[in-house]
Structure formats: C-alpha cells, structure tokens
Amino acid sequence: MGLPWYRVHTVVLNDPGRLLSVHIMHTALVSGWAGSMALYELAVFDPSDPVLDPMWRQGMFVIPFMTRLGITNSWGGWSISGGTVTNPGIWSYEGVAGAHIVFSGLCFLAAIWHWVYWDLEIFCDERTGKPSLDLPKIFGIHLFLAGVACFGFGAFHVTGLYGPGIWVSDPYGLTGKVQAVNPAWGAEGFDPFVPGGIASHHIAAGTLGILAGLFHLSVRPPQRLYKGLRMGNIETVLSSSIAAVFFAAFVVAGTMWYGSATTPIELFGPTRYQWDQGYFQQEIYRRVSDGLAENLSLSEAWSKIPEKLAFYDYIGNNPAKGGLFRAGSMDNGDGIAVGWLGHPIFRDKEGRELFVRRMPTFFETFPVVLVDEEGIVRADVPFRRAESKYSVEQVGVTVEFYGGELNGVSYSDPATVKKYARRSQLGEIFELDRATLKSDGVFRSSPRGWFTFGHATFALLFFFGHIWHGARTLFRDVFAGIDPDLDAQVEFGTFQKVGDPTTRRQPV
C-alpha cells in the first residue's frame, strides 16, 4: 500500500489493537523524553547559587516543573534552595527521572505486545465478529479515570494529605518553598495568583469528571445525537481530543506568559509585565522608604534590599528580551551574574537627585536620559555633542552607590558616570561573568518565553487540526462522493462507483 507520509495513520484506522499499541508507544516516547531530559539537565545544572544563578537563568526546562510539584532534593546531596541534604529519599530529581524512564520501558514492551497481539476478543463486536469500539463507553471510562486522578491530585498531593504539597511563594518570589496548600473555596479561589485555587479547582473539576464519567457509562446517547455528532467514527474522537489539547495549550501559554500561582517566578523567572510596570522597582523603593522612616541611613536602607529582589529588577531577566532564534540559556547571553554592584544615585551640581529612564522591553537601544523627581529632563548623553545642553559634563552629574559591592563609592569622572547611567537603563546593576560560558552579551529568553512560544504555536496548529478532522468526520459522506439526496442504502464496495446514477434506488 503506497501511502504518502501524511496518510500513514490510516493503517490503524480500523484496527483497535494496533491503535492502542501506537498510543502506548507515544506515551513511552513522551515519558522517555521527560526522564532523559531531566537526567541531562541534572548533569549540567549548577545548584551552587540559587539567588544569582537560579534554574531559569541556566535554561532548565523540566526541573522547574518537578520542583513546583514538590521535588526539591537530589541524590547528589544538594537541595534546590541551596542547602545540603543527607537523606533525599526515593522521590528526588533523579528518582523521578528514573521512574519516567522505567515507565517508558514498560510502555515500550506493552506497545510491542499489543502490536503483535492485535486481534483480541475485547475489540470485536460479538454480533458481527468485526473489530469495533464502543466509543461513548470508552469516553465514560476515560472521563471517570481522569476525574479520579484530578480529584486525587487536588485532595491529596496539593493539600499535603498524602503528598508533599506544591511550591508556594510570596508575590516577589523571595521566600518560595514546598508546602501544603488548603483549598480556597471562596471568591479568592478564582484569583490566578492564589495557590489555594489549585487545590479547590482540582477537587471540583475531579468531582465533576467522576460524575460525568459515571453518567456516560450508564446513559447511552440518543440515536439522533449519536449520528449527528458521528459518535461511531474514530475520527470524531481524534477531532475532539485535539480540541481538548489545543484548548489546554492556549490556557497554559497564558498562565505562563502572564504569570500565575502555577508558574512561580523563582522557578520560571519573572514575567515581562513585571519589568514593564516597574513591579520590583516599586517594592525596592517602598522598602528603602520604610528603612529611611526607621531612621536608617540611605546606605543602610539600600544594604537591606535582598540581592534576589534586586536581581529580578534587571532587564536581562525579562523573557521578552530574548530573540526568537537566539538559542541557549540566559547565562549564555549576558553571562552569569556574580554580584550586585549596588544602587546608583545620580545628582547634578545643584544636588538634585536624577533618575535614569529605563529601557522599554522592545527596544535594543535607547537614549540615556536623566530626569528629576518631577519628570523634567536635567541631563543626557547626547547624540550630537555640538548641540548638547544637558550633557553629563555640562550639568556636572555625579554618581554614588548605596548597598551592594560598591556601597559608599562615588564617581564624578564623566566617562564613568556615563557608563553607569547607560547600565542603569537596564535596571539594577550587576557584575556579569561572560568568560566562563563564552557568553556573547546578547539577551536570551527564559524557559517562560520558550514554553509560551512552543505552546501557543502548537495550540494554533492543533486548532487547525481540530477543524480539519472535525470537518472530515462531519462531512465524510460529502467528501466520499455520495449524493446526499440518495435515499437507497448504499454499501461501500458493493458498486463500481458510489453515487452512480445507474445504481438502483429503493426507499429505506
């Protein structure tokens, strides 16, 4: 049978045994990839600095997903939070990876068994002796089992009743840890940033799935609905399954890109909107103001800012700064962060405090402009020196650092002041090691960006797949060339040409 590449799946169209086999093999491939990828990431992951070189800076993709589900320890003796562990237990990162690989092997063997032993009694209609599947019944079984898994995850794993809980953090991604979560049954449960909603929604959705599954197991679909929705056609199953998958892909692309309790910034990096809105900058200034209100000096107030919080307020951690075709981790772009230099405060010769305008997300270059607290431009780095009025030299701008490695250091040399003004466009200033990884200095996206791009793209492709297969199954008679006005029962293969006008017509 000379099938073109895009038609090869017809070999399992009317073969339930081998249809099952290829799906088990697909599960083997997915699970095997997950386990192998986890082992690869663990081989290259450096857990030594969870603050300035976290997993998302290193381009880890599957480690964050394991961590958000409660895995924090490694058989290598390290913990994701930076400490050491002596007894990580079986469910470490390596344990989960190994379990996926073992499961993949078992699925591989099961797929081979079902390919060889395809002609099983269970797949045959006892009335006709031909292969057939009771698709509404199978739908009920799968819905029931999915409901049980969903309910179990929400009621046991997330709540810590039987399981570790999930990763929970504060709004600024500073205090994250794995902990049990109580279900949120009030209106707050609909807030995408409330972890309790994860537990309550899984419990509710699981309960609904169990009830719906039992309904579909006990109630047969009406004949008109069965025929109208082509419930006897396996391509209907394909079409509706693709719909479920593309819908889920669109949803998770949104929760990843815009942020939610399911995508903590400690595991996936900050979102672009946190840079756009000055989210971390506002929190830093609030903390400094509180420190000054407690009679701390400016230097002491800035020194109390956690390095982790300052690092979030750096444009290099913005997932929208990476180009679409710039492969590699963030560390391969601007380098490995070594330390926070401190917060630079610029002043003109009249003593006014000046603020550097920050670079918007979608700019590669941006003019260096310093404004006062009222937003009036007081200094800049001019493009044309001949026409400049606000140059650093003319205005006499100086810079002094507070907190960080350069705490208390000040510069009045114009070249140095301009250097730090340029770097202030990018947020807080960090020392970056570009030599170790031969980093090229061009920003990369975080796993947050890659996940969103991948899932949004595949969701769009799968959307078209749903339309394609849905149309094929709904209009199968039209595509097959059968005259819709034909009132005789025509059997495929009985006549030389289906829809031939010489075919005898008789009322059904």
Swiss-Prot record:
GO cellular component: chloroplast thylakoid membrane; photosystem II; plastid
Alphabetized UniProt keyword annotations: Chlorophyll, Chloroplast, Chromophore, Membrane, Photosynthesis, Photosystem II, Plastid, Thylakoid, Transmembrane, Transmembrane helix
GO molecular function: chlorophyll binding; electron transporter, transferring electrons within the cyclic electron transport pathway of photosynthesis activity
One BP annotation, GO: photosynthetic electron transport in photosystem II
Subcellular localization, as worded in the UniProt entry: Plastid, Chloroplast thylakoid membrane
Transmembrane segments: 21-36, 101-115, 140-156, 203-218, 237-252, 457-472
Subunit relationships: PSII is composed of 1 copy each of membrane proteins PsbA, PsbB, PsbC, PsbD, PsbE, PsbF, PsbH, PsbI, PsbJ, PsbK, PsbL, PsbM, PsbT, PsbX, PsbY, PsbZ, Psb30/Ycf12, at least 3 peripheral proteins of the oxygen-evolving complex and a large number of cofactors. It forms dimeric complexes.
HAMAP family named in the record: PSII_PsbB_CP47 (MF_01495)
Family note: Belongs to the PsbB/PsbC family. PsbB subfamily.
Function comment: One of the components of the core complex of photosystem II (PSII). It binds chlorophyll and helps catalyze the primary light-induced photochemical processes of PSII. PSII is a light-driven water:plastoquinone oxidoreductase, using light energy to abstract electrons from H(2)O, generating O(2) and a proton gradient subsequently used for ATP formation.
Protein's name according to its UniProt entry: Photosystem II CP47 reaction center protein
Gene: psbB
